[in-house]
Amino acid sequence: MTRIRRGYIARRRRTKIRLFASSFRGAHSRLTRTITQQKIRALVSAHRDRDRQKINFRRLWITRINAAIRERGVCYSYSRFINDLYKRQLLLNRKILAQIAISNRNCLYMISNEIIKEVSWKESTG
């Protein structure tokens, strides 16, 4: 049987994979099979962590808002604050509220005080 000389296609494919893994350490950037495995693993981790990042940021925003709210009012919590925001139909998302809590805490206190006053006034009047 005659020998078949491989063309440039396989070499081009391997070069493309090697460029992806050029920043990896050791055999993960040198051996083709290992590079392929590490590329799959890296892409899986990236996909998983994109979702995890959204969850972590939401958790961070909620923690910051809750800390700022509890600092001012003793018996007032994050869940009551968000519930009162929805009742008042104020469309402020958690990201914006967390930024306000860090940069301009007095503004957040003003918002929460207005909401507390209005909700308590509505509850007292019926």
Swiss-Prot record:
InterPro entries in alphabetical order? Ribosomal_bL20, RIBOSOMAL_L20_CS, Ribosomal_protein_bL20_C
Q: Where in the cell is it found?
A: Plastid, Chloroplast
CC annotations in GO: chloroplast; ribonucleoprotein complex; ribosome
Keyword Membrane (UniProt): no
An example of a Pfam family matching this protein is: Ribosomal_L20
Q: Which family does it belong to?
A: Belongs to the bacterial ribosomal protein bL20 family.
* Function according to Swiss-Prot or TrEMBL: Binds directly to 23S ribosomal RNA and is necessary for the in vitro assembly process of the 50S ribosomal subunit. It is not involved in the protein synthesizing functions of that subunit.
Q: What is this protein called?
A: Large ribosomal subunit protein bL20c
| Source organism (scientific name) | Helianthus annuus (Common sunflower)
- Taxonomic lineage of the native organism: Eukaryota, Viridiplantae, Streptophyta, Embryophyta, Tracheophyta
